[in-house]
Every structure is written in structure tokens, then in C-alpha cells.
């Protein structure tokens, strides 16, 4: 269908060639969206500018194509004449020559569309099953005791991983589980390596890696059996497959994805300097805690020492108290004696007024007074004897007196008086206090 507004009537305007070509280019670019075209590459020319020029052809026709440098630089493979490809292109017109051409945005080998569809279908199905869910991801141990590597031997990827591990933590043991990572048997070999690592259970984390390549080269990591083996593995897995722009099904299922094999090694192994810095930090924290604890204990010791009374002082206080009790007792007996005397005198006076035989009553009163005097003297002497005994008993309890009799007092390293052999152990230090001086000793044997 032709829009009459696009081409004015010939009688009114005569088009110049450049105007016509520009107008046709605009119509083509605005009319046709990006589309995929398949064909065979021919006459491929790579210019110093980095741009590629070639033709796409089939059995019946061909079309000129251009792929600019900022587009082709991201290809991980090099097209050749005769290669069957699929190109995502914008239809345009090269105005200078009036040539119809395709500006290529993306280029892939023929058949990769099927691979991408297979990739997306499997990705969607596994995602719906929950294999990509974060809650199923295992934590990567911060300080693994041993690391396992699943990859092909004698490859740049393996060398990069080993070099990185050696640089970050040279003392970390490494186990290599060799498996081809490209080809028809690669997927089953990777699954077998994962099973062996699980059975041997000798590593804390696994690195699954390989270098860059095309989608076909990396396809083993898009196989369902590999994805399910990774999901079932009880050992945390870090993937480092291809380059940063490469994503595989294995990356989505793994516990952690790194952009490259080197990046996987950096995620799996801690850096020695970081460990040293962390150890220094905790050493400093521990030292501060110990110093604060010692300071608190010293303050507590000073407080207890201030409150602690020497045994000699306690005996002196007891003697003073005993002397006070003695004085109070004497004062009480004196008062009681005065009361008794007053009563006797009152009784004597009453007798004198009531009975004529004053002499008999007086003799009886004198006898009672003498008996009372003897009783008082006897009681005082008895109390005096008890007081002397108490003083002697207190004197025997004085640690200095005990030490002067040839005994000694042994203290533990914590300052406690040693009363039981279970308070100490072989190798402990003790302090022995004598009547004069002290000594330190080391325990070589204890008997329970």
C-alpha cells in the first residue's frame, strides 16, 4: 500500500538522487523493525577501522551487510566465509551508492536459536521448581579447611584458579576432581566429579570452572543433569564459567556465581592479609578485655583488703569488749551488794522495833552479812578464773601465737588460706607464712 504523502506528484517536485535515497532509507528504517535473517557469509572483509563488510546469501539471493566495530567486538567467535549464521539486523539503504543493505546488530551461528530456546525453557522450568531460590543457597564458609576444583586439567582456567589460591592463602589444601568441560561426555563427567566429591566429603567448598568460549563450548553447564547434581550437592559450590557476560544454568543453581575462574577462587578462599588483620583486631579486643578484667579484679581486691581486719586486731577488740563486760559485772555486783546491805539494815531496824532480843537478831544479821560477803568473794573469784581462761583461750587463737609455737600458714596463689589438698594441684605456687618471714613453694605432689 502506497502513501501518496510520501511521494508528491512529479509535476510539482523533481527529486534529486541524494534526496530520494535519503527518503527511501528513512522509510525502510521506520517501516521494518529489527529482524532475524539466516544465510551464508560470503566476501567477508575486515577493515582496519574494525568494521566488517560481507554478504548474506542463500540459493536464490544475497544482500549486502555491515557490522560495525562497536557491535562485532563482543563476539566470542570469528566468522568465516561459508559459515551459516543468523543475524539480527536493521534494514537500511547506503545513500552514497543507493545500495540496499543490512546493518547487523547481533550475529550467531546457525542453530543457536534452538539452543537459546532450549536454554530458556530449562531455565524457566527449573526456576518454577525453586532450584534458583535464595533460601536453598548454602553459605560459602569464610575459612574453608580444604577446597575442591572441578575442571579439566592442563587448562588456563585451572592455572588461574591455582595461582589465585596460592596468592591468597598458600597454606590452603586443594583437591582437583578432573572432568572434561566441553564435548558430549562433559555433562556426565561433571556429574560424576560432583558425586565423587560428595562421597569423599573432604572439601568445605567446591569451585566449578572453565574458561571462555561459545555457547556450544559452554553447553555442558546448561544440561539438566548438571543443574540437578549441583542442587543436590551438600557441599557449597562456587561457579566461575566463561567470561563476565556468560551465564549458564549452572550459575543460576550454584550457591554463588563468579564472573571468571579467578573470581571464583577469590570468593572461595579468604585472603591471608584479611585473616591477619582480623586476628590482630580480635587479639587487640581480647587484650583489652583481659586488661579490663584484671583492673576490676584489682579494684575488688583493694576493696576487700580495706575491709579485711587482721586476726590480731579482732582479738584486741574481743579483749576490750571482755574488759568492758568485766567492769559492768563488777559494777552490777557492787550495786547488788549495796541493795542487800540496805535491805539488811532495814530488816535490822524492823527487828529492833519489833523484838526486844536485839543482840540475837544482830548476831544473826552479822552472820548473814558474813555469809553474803563470802558468797560475793567466791562469785567474784569464780568469774575472775573464767575471765583468765577466756583470755588464755583468745591468746591461743592469735595466729602470731600459733606461728611462734612452730606452726605456719599456707596461702594459695589467689590469697586464700590453704585448708584442703583439693584446693591445689601439682605445679601450683603457694606462699608459706612463718612467725618470722615467709617463703614461696611449688607443689610437686598432692595426696587427697
UniProtKB/Swiss-Prot annotation:
One Pfam entry name: tRNA_anti_2
One Gene Ontology CC term in the entry: cytoplasm
Protein keywords: Cytoplasm, Exonuclease, Hydrolase, Nuclease
Catalytic activity, reaction form: Exonucleolytic cleavage in either 5'- to 3'- or 3'- to 5'-direction to yield nucleoside 5'-phosphates
Entry's localization field: Cytoplasm
Primary localisation category: cytoplasm
CDD domains for the chain: ExoVII_LU_OBF
EC number in record: 3.1.11.6
GO terms, biological process: DNA catabolic process
Coiled-coil stretches: none
Family affiliation: Belongs to the XseA family.
Subunit record text: Heterooligomer composed of large and small subunits.
Protein name per its UniProtKB record: Exodeoxyribonuclease 7 large subunit
Organism for this UniProt entry: Nitrosomonas eutropha (strain DSM 101675 / C91 / Nm57)
Taxonomic classification: Bacteria, Pseudomonadati, Pseudomonadota, Betaproteobacteria, Nitrosomonadales
Gene giving rise to this polypeptide: xseA
Amino acid at each position: 500500500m502506497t502513501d501518496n504523502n510520501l511521494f508528491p506528484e512529479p509535476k510539482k517536485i523533481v527529486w534529486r538522487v541524494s534526496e530520494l535515497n535519503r527518503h527511501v532509507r528513512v522509510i525502510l528504517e521506520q517501516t521494518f523493525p529489527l529482524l532475524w535473517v539466516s544465510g551464508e557469509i560470503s566476501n567477508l572483509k575486515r577493515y582496519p577501522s574494525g568494521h566488517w563488510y560481507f554478504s548474506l546469501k542463500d540459493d536464490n539471493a544475497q544482500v549486502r551487510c555491515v557490522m560495525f566495530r562497536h557491535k562485532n567486538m563482543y563476539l566470542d567467535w570469528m566468522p568465516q566465509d561459508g559459515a551459516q549464521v543468523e543475524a539480527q539486523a536493521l534494514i537500511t539503504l547506503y545513500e552514497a551508492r543507493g545500495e540496499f543493505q543490512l546493518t547487523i546488530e547481533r550475529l550467531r551461528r546457525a542453530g543457536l536459536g534452538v539452543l537459546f530456546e532450549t536454554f530458556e525453557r530449562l531455565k524457566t522450568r527449573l526456576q518454577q521448581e525453586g532450584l534458583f531460590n535464595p533460601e536453598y543457597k548454602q553459605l560459602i564458609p569464610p575459612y574453608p579447611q580444604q577446597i575442591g576444583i572441578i575442571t579439566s586439567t592442563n587448562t588456563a582456567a585451572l592455572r588461574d584458579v591455582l595461582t589465585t589460591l596460592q596468592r591468597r592463602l598458600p597454606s590452603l589444601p586443594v583437591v582437583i576432581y578432573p572432568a572434561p568441560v566441553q564435548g558430549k561426555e562433559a555433562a556426565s563427567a561433571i556429574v560424576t566429579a560432583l558425586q565423587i566429591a560428595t562421597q569423599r566429603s573432604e572439601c568445605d567448598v567446591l569451585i566449578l570452572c572453565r574458561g571462555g568460549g561459545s555457547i556450544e563450548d559452554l553447553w555442558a553447564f546448561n544440561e539438566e543433569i548438571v543443574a540437578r547434581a549441583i542442587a543436590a550437592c551438600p557441599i557449597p559450590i562456587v561457579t566461575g564459567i566463561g567470561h563476565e557476560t556468560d551465564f549458564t544454568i549452572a550459575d543460576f543453581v550454584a550457591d554463588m556465581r563468579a564472573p571468571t575462574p579467578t573470581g571464583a577462587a577469590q570468593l572461595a578462599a579468604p585472603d591471608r592479609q584479611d585473616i591477619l588483620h582480623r586476628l590482630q583486631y580480635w587479639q587487640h579486643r581480647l587484650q583489652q578485655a583481659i586488661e579490663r578484667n584484671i583492673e576490676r579484679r584489682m579494684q575488688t581486691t583493694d576493696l576487700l583488703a580495706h575491709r579485711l581486719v587482721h586476726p590480731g586486731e579482732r582479738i584486741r577488740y574481743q579483749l576490750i569488749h571482755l574488759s568492758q563486760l568485766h567492769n559492768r559485772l563488777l559494777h552490777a555486783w557492787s550495786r547488788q551488794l549495796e541493795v542487800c546491805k540496805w535491805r539488811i539494815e532495814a530488816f535490822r531496824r524492823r527487828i529492833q522495833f519489833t523484838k526486844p532480843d536485839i543482840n540475837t537478831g544482830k548476831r544473826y544479821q552479822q552472820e548473814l552479812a558474813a555469809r553474803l560477803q563470802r558468797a560475793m568473794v567466791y562469785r567474784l573469784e569464780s568469774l575472775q578464773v573464767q575471765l583468765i581462761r577466756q583470755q588464755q583461750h583468745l591468746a591461743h587463737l592469735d595466729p602470731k601465737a600459733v606461728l611462734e609455737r612452730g606452726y605456719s600458714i599456707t596461702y594459695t596463689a589467689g590469697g586464700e588460706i590453704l585448708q584442703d589438698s583439693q584446693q591445689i594441684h601439682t605445679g601450683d605456687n603457694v606462699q608459706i607464712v612463718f612467725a618470722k618471714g615467709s617463703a614461696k613453694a611449688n607443689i610437686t605432689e598432692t595426696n587427697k
